[in-house]
Curated annotation (Swiss-Prot):
Pathway entry: Steroid metabolism; ergosterol biosynthesis
Identification of the protein by name: Sterol 14-alpha demethylase CYP51A
GO cellular component terms given for this protein: endoplasmic reticulum membrane
Pfam family, one: p450
Up-regulation conditions: Expression is induced by azole antifungals such as prochloraz, tebuconazole or epoxiconazole. Expression is positively regulated by the FgSR transcription factor that targets gene promoters containing 2 conserved CGAA repeat sequences.
Family the entry assigns: Belongs to the cytochrome P450 family.
Length: 507
């Protein structure tokens, strides 16, 4: 019997010794140029639980104790958080030779997006790829997207069983995930791709999305069930796009004039003279679909949930359309120019992106020692630096009652000024560095999201269309929205999240 107990006992003793050694190590004097280390009980795992359950709360507590710059341990990695507007600027505008995103995000994204695109290619090539896909984000393209998006929303609410009858309930995150994949595919990718968005294709998208689980930051190639589904889905989805491309190469299908992304990419050439290979076109299309859907799905869900919690805002949005857009008492189909006539709608989108950013942490791998401005700290190459624009967006320093969702806070707030001299071209067009603003819902620097204008158009049209057709309320009639689910790479409302809808009378 003693022999059966001795081995577990030794394991416990060894574990206890490791914990004690870790605690003693944290008490040792640190070099003055090293950022303070956040306390943690267990080596390797470090602060993973506290950070994973509530990253924003974790940042807030650490900031109170250590200031804007501190180190925490995340599964063996030393993460140096650089918070505040200065921290955002330091991380997001870091020079490519000092810090890069590829080493952090490559292992996670390559199995999902595919090879030779985004983080599986030199940064200069990524900048060219971003320039190629801006074809679908021009002013002319955005104007053409509006009625396509509106039609997709109307088709969904007219045909989906969840919207049958005069009133019922609906699981908001589920519905908005479906609506946004339809709007993103139809507007950014074209009618041909949209037609292929059958239930089978949607299932492939879901399986591919499983690849964005946080565990895949560390173990992207583990033969876990969700990774096997991810890999199979990527192959099948790539085949869908390759079939379209091959048919077009043979001249069998006519492209849509001016709005078809596949046709655009088929005609693009890199600076070295090489046409974009068909495989890379397919991988860019997968990337574009997922990038266009993820943030819109989360943001639109939060908007609808807040509108259900605040029916007065919903009615203000409806009246705003009646006052500014109605013709002879009726609301005509939306046009791009209509969005500028709906300031409250824009403020609802803006406020939701402030309170509910889908990405709370932005990481870069340090390649050369970096001196943190206005501090004694030097960050060495064994570390990863991290910015969190969410921290400034939710700070009382910049926004009164920052944790309260209040679209009217933007009514009299001067538009964030952009220094026209602080502009840089990373290879895909001139953009503002923008990192001195406390409000950065689309990031900043060379990896700033190029789909900002599309996101505002997509969200604005979706919300305007829903408000035209429905009154919204919470199930029990009391205000409130769900907690945030941080278990995925992209923050989103905890599911399920049901609300009640009531169809408006036609005017």
């Amino acid at each position: 019997m003693f022999h059966l107990l001795i081995y577990p006992l030794w394991v416990l003793v060894a574990l206890f010794a490791v914990i004690i050694a870790n605690l003693l190590y944290q008490q040792l004097p640190r070099r003055p140029d090293e950022p303070p280390l956040v306390f943690h009980w267990f080596p390797f795992f470090g602060n993973a639980v506290a950070y994973g359950l509530d990253p924003c709360g974790f940042f807030e507590k650490c900031r109170e104790k250590h200031g804007d710059v501190f180190t925490f341990i995340l599964f063996g990695r030393k993460i140096v958080a650089c918070l505040g507007v200065d921290g955002n600027d330091f991380v997001l505008n870091s020079r490519l030779q000092d810090a890069n995103a590829e080493e952090v995000y490559g292992p996670l994204t390559i199995p999902v997006f595919g090879s030779d695109v985004v983080y599986d290619c030199p940064n200069s090539k990524l900048m060219e790829q971003k320039k190629f896909v801006k074809f679908g984000l021009t002013q002319k393209a955005l104007e053409s997207h509006v009625q396509l998006i509106e039609r997709e929303v109307l088709d969904y609410v007219e045909t989906d069983p969840s919207f049958s009858g005069r009133t019922s309930t609906i699981d908001v995150p589920k519905a908005m995930a479906e609506i946004t994949i339809f709007t993103a595919s139809r507007s950014l990718q074209g009618e041909e791709v949209r037609r292929k968005l059958t239930a089978e294709f949607a299932a492939l998208y879901h399986d591919l999305d499983l690849g964005f689980r946080p565990v895949n930051f560390l173990f992207p190639w583990l033969p876990l069930p969700h990774n096997r589904k991810r890999d199979a889905a990527h192959i099948k989805m790539r085949e869908v796009y390759m079939d379209i491309i091959n048919d077009r190469r043979k001249g069998g299908i006519r492209t849509e004039d001016g709005t078809d992304m596949i046709a655009n990419l088929m005609g693009c050439t890199y600076k070295n003279g090489q046409p974009v290979p068909d495989k890379e076109i397919a991988h860019m299309m997968i990337t574009l679909l997922m990038a266009g859907q993820h943030s819109s799905s989360s943001a639109s869900s939060w908007i609808v949930l807040h509108l259900a919690s605040s029916p007065d805002i919903t009615e203000e949005l409806y009246q705003e359309q009646l006052v500014n857009l109605s013709v002879n008492g009726a609301l005509p189909p939306l046009q791009y120019s209509d969005l500028d006539k709906l300031p409250l709608l824009q403020n609802v989108v803006k406020e939701t992106l402030r309170v509910h950013s889908s990405i709370h942490s932005i990481l870069r791998k340090v390649k050369r020692p970096m001196q943190v401005p206005n501090s004694p700290y030097t960050i060495t190459t064994d570390k990863v630096i991290m910015a969190s624009p969410t921290v400034t967006a939710m700070s009382e320093e910049y926004f009164e009652n920052a944790k309260t969702w209040n679209p009217h806070r933007w009514d009299n707030r001067a538009k964030e000024e952009v220094d026209t001299e602080d502009v840089i071209d990373y290879g895909y067009g001139a953009v503002s560095k923008g990192t001195k603003s406390p409000y950065l819902p689309f990031g900043a620097g060379r990896h700033r999201c190029i789909g900002e204008k599309f996101a505002y158009v997509n969200l604005g049209v979706i919300v305007a269309t829903l408000v035209r057709n429905f009154r919204l309320s919470t199930i029990d009639g009391r205000p409130g929205v769900p907690e945030t689910d941080y278990t995925s790479l992209f923050s989103r409302p905890a599911q399920p999240a049901f609300i009640r809808w009531e169809r408006r009378k036609k005017i």
